[in-house]
C-alpha cells in the first residue's frame, strides 16, 4: 500500500471516482485523507476483522464520509455491514446503558437490523462513518479487496484528525485560496 500511496496522482484519481456524488453530499471545497487505506479480507480469516463501531465514537468528525471502493464483487460476509440511520438513532439513545459491553455483545444486539451491503466491482459506496458498521469473518470462498478514504468539507469542524496531519484540501475555490493566504497590512 505504501507504493500505491506513493503514486503521484492516486489521490486525484480516487477523488475523481466519487466526485459526482461527493460534491452534492459534502460540498465543493473538500479535504481528503492523506493516505488511502487498503483492506484485504481472506476467506475464514479472523485476523482482519473490524468489530462494530462508528468512527465518531473514537473522535472522528461527524462531518466526514467514507468513499469505499471494492476491487471485487462484495456481498454477504465478503462485504461490510451498516446499521441504518433509524436503528443507529435508537442505539445512540441507549448507548450509555450499554457502556462496558463488548463489541461482540453490541453486534449481537443489533445483528437483526444491520444491512449487509452488496457493492459490485466497478461501483463506489459513500457512507456516513457516524453510522455503526464493521465486518465479520468472510465465509465466502473469495478474498475481499477494497480501498477506503475519508472526505469532508474543508471548513467544517475537525475531530481528532486535523487538516495538514490527516487531511489535505483537494478542491479549493479561488476566493478560499485568496482568503487563506491573505495577510492584513500592518498598522502602526
Model-identified regions with their sequence ranges:
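Short N-terminal helix-initiation segments at or just after the protein's N-terminus
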Residues: 2-15, 66-69, 90-97, 143-146
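Signature of the catalytic double-stranded beta-helix
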Residues: 1-41, 45, 52-53, 58-63
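Hydrophobic/aromatic-lined pockets within catalytic cores
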Residues: 23-27, 72, 130
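Residues that flank catalytic or metal-binding motifs in active/ligand-binding sites
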Residues: 34, 63, 76, 143-147
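A structural signal for short, well-ordered beta-strand segments and their strand-loop junctions
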Residues: 30-37, 66-70, 79-82, 126-127
Amino acid at each position: 500500500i505504501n507504493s500505491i500511496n506513493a503514486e503521484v496522482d492516486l489521490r486525484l484519481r480516487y477523488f475523481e471516482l466519487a466526485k459526482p456524488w461527493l460534491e452534492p453530499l459534502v460540498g465543493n471545497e473538500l479535504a481528503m485523507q492523506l493516505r488511502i487505506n487498503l483492506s484485504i479480507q481472506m476467506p475464514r480469516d479472523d485476523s482482519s476483522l473490524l468489530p462494530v463501531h462508528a468512527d465518531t465514537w473514537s473522535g472522528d468528525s461527524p462531518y466526514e464520509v467514507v468513499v469505499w471502493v471494492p476491487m471485487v464483487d462484495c456481498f454477504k460476509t465478503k462485504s461490510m455491514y451498516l446499521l441504518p440511520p433509524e436503528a443507529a438513532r435508537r442505539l445512540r439513545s441507549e448507548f450509555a446503558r450499554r457502556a462496558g459491553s463488548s463489541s461482540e455483545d453490541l453486534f449481537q444486539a443489533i445483528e437483526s437490523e444491520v444491512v449487509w451491503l452488496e457493492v459490485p466491482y466497478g461501483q463506489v459506496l459513500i457512507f456516513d462513518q457516524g453510522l455503526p458498521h464493521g465486518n465479520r469473518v468472510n465465509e465466502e470462498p473469495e478474498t475481499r479487496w477494497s480501498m477506503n478514504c475519508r472526505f469532508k468539507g474543508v471548513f467544517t469542524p475537525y475531530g481528532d484528525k486535523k487538516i495538514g496531519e490527516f487531511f489535505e484540501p483537494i478542491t479549493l475555490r479561488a476566493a478560499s485560496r485568496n482568503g487563506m493566504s491573505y495577510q492584513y497590512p500592518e498598522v502602526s
